[in-house]
């Protein structure tokens, strides 16, 4: 199976179910809470793996506890994390997500700190049958989509706003 190279963001989401979304500078109590994997690319890679496909994820993480949680969770889901870049001293991305009784949500995201901006490592990916890139890391998306064009395989963009329109150039 050729599989899919997925390039982009991987995070941990701390999800809190609340009666109403926070609106005042005070403490709120959650009805329930859970810690789940998140991020456009990571979610796509998990979906591919759960459907029986091969997913190789290229994402940028710190060498911190959050990064370790992300890699362990993705590994349990069957995602190949060999391309995940762990930067010494960097901090991985995570979010607090509040979901009210109507299903509306608020997300507070920490995008990470000190993560590598280098994209050359993406070219070390094994040849795959398709490439999916999210726009939360536009430089990585551009590099991954160029690789898809080089391989002659579909390049798909998960274009979550805000995005750099230049990332769409390599999509097919």
Task: Please describe what each predicted stretch is.
Residues 1-10, 56, 72-86, 98-172:
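Ribokinase/PfkB-type carbohydrate-kinase core domain
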Residues 1-60, 65-68:
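Glycine-rich phosphate/adenosyl-contacting loop at the front of the ribokinase-like
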Residues 33-37, 88, 140:
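Residues at the start of alpha-helices and the adjacent loop-to-helix junctions
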Residues 40-43, 66, 91-92, 140-143:
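Short glycine/serine/threonine-rich phosphate/pyrophosphate-binding segments
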Residues 51, 77, 90-93:
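Short, basic and Ser/Thr-rich N-terminal targeting/leader segments
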Residues 60, 93-98:
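Catalytic-core segment of enzymes that process non-peptidic bonds
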Residues 63, 89, 163:
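Positions that flank functional sites
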Residues 67-68, 92-94, 166-168:
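Short Asp/Glu-rich motifs
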């Amino acid at each position: 199976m050729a599989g899919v190279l997925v390039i982009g963001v991987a995070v941990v989401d701390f999800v809190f179910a609340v009666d109403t979304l926070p609106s005042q500078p005070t403490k709120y109590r959650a009805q329930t809470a859970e810690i789940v994997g998140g991020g456009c690319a990571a979610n796509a890679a998990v979906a591919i793996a759960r459907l029986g496909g091969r997913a190789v994820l290229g994402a940028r993480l710190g060498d911190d506890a959050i990064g370790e949680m992300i890699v362990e969770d993705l590994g349990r889901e069957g995602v190949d994390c060999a391309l995940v870049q762990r930067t010494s001293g960097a901090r991985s991305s995570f979010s607090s997500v509040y979901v009210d009784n109507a299903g509306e949500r608020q997300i507070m995201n920490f995008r990470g700190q000190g993560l590598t901006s280098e994209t050359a490592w993406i070219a070390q990916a094994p040849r795959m049958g398709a490439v999916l890139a999210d726009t939360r890391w536009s430089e990585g998306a551009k590099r991954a989509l160029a690789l898809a064009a080089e391989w002659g395989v579909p390049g798909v963009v998960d274009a979550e706003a805000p995005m750099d329109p230049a990332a769409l150039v390599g999509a097919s």
